[in-house]
Amino acid sequence: MNISIVVSTRDPVGETIKKLGYKFEEIDEDEVDFRFERGDAIVIFSKHQSSSKTPALTVHYPGNPSSQVLGGEPEKLGVAFPRLLTAIFREINKLDIPVQKTLEATHHGPTYQKVPIVFVEVGSDPTYWGNEKIVKSLVESTLSAIDKVSSLYCEEIIVGFGGPHYAPYFSKLGEKVCIGHIISKYYLASIKDTTIIQTVEKCMENVDTVVFDSVPLSVRDKVMHVLKDRNLKFKFH
């Protein structure tokens, strides 16, 4: 499998990776709205920002679950690749670095590509974006993970609904299962049927199970109704 590794010349983590001597694909585009598409899947390194400025290493898929857009298109998800995302996250979790390590729910663009995209991010301020030791460790873990994708152990492939944007429950599940799209609780009240369907259809691997994390009964019923004919299991937390 040909997995393209990408950095943006407009991104500070990308610049740190270049300083370290890595030769990855370079794009001169905003990382949340790029059009690059080469290979069977894309891994892009980028900065992570948060208001709390919590030091973190995060992994997630792109996609806009609502009409609110930050790059890409409204109500459109990117393509998920559960074994790739989960392999990367498991390797990052092994790092002896005192920062938060977490999956994030699906958010921001791009959404144009027909191949999966996984964001691997360093947060949450310039101190960490330019920290060569942390960035190098992240890159090496990701490269190691890519080599393990084809043989990665997955009890099942899941998609998730509910929980906060930083997804501790789904991050914990990732120790044994492989994770597709996660739609956080903030989008559920107004989520459209078409977006629910995309969580399953826009996945490189067949989804086995839908997992709900503290989701109201009305939303659970809606999701289960929309996906009722797809031979899926449903689990509740």
Curated annotation (Swiss-Prot):
NCBIfam families, from UniProt?
PRK03995.1-1
Cofactor binding remark: Binds 2 Zn(2+) ions per subunit.
Enzyme Commission number(s) of this protein: 3.1.1.96
Which reaction is catalysed here?
Answer: a D-aminoacyl-tRNA + H2O = a tRNA + a D-alpha-amino acid + H(+); glycyl-tRNA(Ala) + H2O = tRNA(Ala) + glycine + H(+)
Q: Which biological process, per GO, is one annotated for this protein? A: D-amino acid catabolic process
User: Which InterPro entries does the record cross-reference, listed alphabetically?
Assistant: Deacylase_DtdA_archaea (IPR018033), DtdA (IPR007508)
Under the subunit heading, UniProt states: Monomer.
Q: Could you say which protein family the record assigns here?
A: Belongs to the DtdA deacylase family.
One Pfam entry for this protein is tRNA_deacylase
Q: Which domain of life is it from?
A: Archaea
Q: Name one GO molecular function term.
A: zinc ion binding
Question: Protein name, please?
Answer: D-aminoacyl-tRNA deacylase
By its UniProt entry, which PANTHER family does this protein fall under?
D-AMINOACYL-TRNA DEACYLASE
Q: List the disulfide bonds.
A: none
Summary of the function given for this chain in its UniProt record: D-aminoacyl-tRNA deacylase with broad substrate specificity. By recycling D-aminoacyl-tRNA to D-amino acids and free tRNA molecules, this enzyme counteracts the toxicity associated with the formation of D-aminoacyl-tRNA entities in vivo.
- Organism whose genome encodes this protein: Sulfolobus acidocaldarius (strain ATCC 33909 / DSM 639 / JCM 8929 / NBRC 15157 / NCIMB 11770)
UniProt entry keywords in alphabetical sequence: Hydrolase, Metal-binding, Zinc
Q: Species lineage, top-down?
A: Archaea, Thermoproteota, Thermoprotei, Sulfolobales, Sulfolobaceae
Cofactor(s) it depends on: Zn(2+)
